[in-house]
Design a protein with these regions (language model features):
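Substrate-engagement module of ASCE P-loop NTPases
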Residues: 2-9, 36-52, 96
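Conserved P-loop NTPase "ATPase switch" module shared by AAA+ and STAND
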Residues: 7-31
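Conserved nucleotide-binding/hydrolysis micro-motifs of P-loop NTPases
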Residues: 24-25, 59-64, 83-87, 145-146, ...
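C-terminal helical "lid" subdomain and adjoining coupling/linker elements of P-loop NTPases
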Residues: 33, 105, 116-230, 234-237, ...
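Sensor-1/coupling segment of RecA-like P-loop NTPase cores
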Residues: 44-68
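Conserved small helical "lid"/interfacial subdomain of P-loop NTPases
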Residues: 80-124, 139-141
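A short, conserved structural fragment
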Residues: 268, 281-297
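Short, amphipathic alpha-helical interaction segments positioned at domain boundaries
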Residues: 297-309
Length: 309
């Protein structure tokens, strides 16, 4: 048939893998679709005498729903994805570096370990010694920020690890593209995640349109206005964490935390940035009336102030 003609080489049919991406979402609760997927995979596997292998992906195990259980005989090997798999895929596929570039990356982060290790200190996301074994592999994303992103993505996407993997792959890929032309020593800011998920969050009513429009307005302004917009993005992302999660990891949108996540130039350090934040936060609170401050034991915390709140 057409498949044999297209794939055969020298009259031999090669071992062939076919991936049915998001087959679970395609089938849904439709028993007819489940039956058709079962029939097609069985027929083709028999016809090609085991030379054809099907892999199906979904948000949860096949045993999770009655409609998918009928496929278990056809897809007998379950593979559950965990956080470690997500990190491995992003490091090996997207963040891989030429061997010639690795020594320079290694030298830069080691020279700036003082700045890196102070970020989010005192929280469960803080720098740990183990980070140093993946720092070169993760560059231009700092491990502390990767952990922050994972927490936020898990909060906004409750469908499962497969979907989170896709979200993380996309975000990491965009982060690499955004920093590709910059000098070694530039890292991706914590607020970068906002730009990747904002449109989707507006459409699902998880991001107030008022916040979205103000961020866009600030982004179109000068450097000072842009920094205000970035503060707003970060405050939104941190506020997005459920209160029990934020309490558990010890993360609050304080001046120090915001500065820790905003630093992009490791060589320049963060002292100038830290000096610039207080007047901007004051403006966002008293002039723009977009944030409010709450005084607590660990310093002043900032929260979004929208008409809805």
């Amino acid at each position: 048939g057409a498949i044999t003609d297209a794939l055969s080489r020298n009259g031999k049919f090669p071992l062939t893998l076919i991936v049915l991406d998001e087959v679970q979402q395609y089938i849904g609760s439709d028993t007819q679709k489940a039956y058709l997927v079962q029939e097609v995979t069985e027929t083709l596997c028999k016809h090609f005498k085991g030379q054809l292998l099907f892999v199906g992906t979904g948000q949860s195990a096949l045993s999770g729903t009655a409609n998918l259980q009928r496929l278990m005989a056809r897809f007998p090997v379950p593979v559950m994805l965990g956080d470690w798999d997500v990190e491995n895929v992003t490091r090996k596929i997207i963040l891989a570096k030429k061997p010639t570039a690795q020594p320079e990356v290694d030298r830069i982060w080691r020279a700036n370990l003082g700045e890196i290790s102070r970020h989010l200190r005192g929280t469960k996301l803080e720098h740990v010694t183990d980070d140093e074994s993946v720092m070169t592999a993760d560059y231009p994303i700092l491990p502390v920020r990767r952990r922050f992103w994972e927490k936020v993505l898990r909060t906004i996407d409750t469908t499962g690890t497969v979907s989170q993997l896709r979200s993380q792959l996309r975000v990491v890929h965009e982060a690499v593209l955004a920093t590709a032309d910059q000098a070694v020593g530039q890292v991706v800011a914590g607020d970068f995640l906002y730009d990747q998920i904002a449109a989707n969050l507006v459409s699902t009513a998880q991001l107030p349109r008022e916040v979205f429009e103000n961020v866009q307005k600030f982004a179109a302004g000068d450097e000072r206005m842009q920094l205000k917009g970035r503060l707003l993005k970060l405050i939104f992302l941190i506020n997005k964490l459920p209160s029990e999660t934020a309490l558990d990891i010890g993360l609050r949108a304080t001046e120090d935390v915001l500065a820790d996540l905003l630093v992009t130039d490791l060589k320049a350090g963060s002292s100038e940035l830290r000096k610039a934040l207080p007047p901007l936060l004051d403006e966002l609170q008293h002039k723009d009336r977009l944030v409010m401050s709450l005084d607590g034991g660990g310093g002043t915390e900032y929260r979004l102030q929208t008409r809805e709140s």
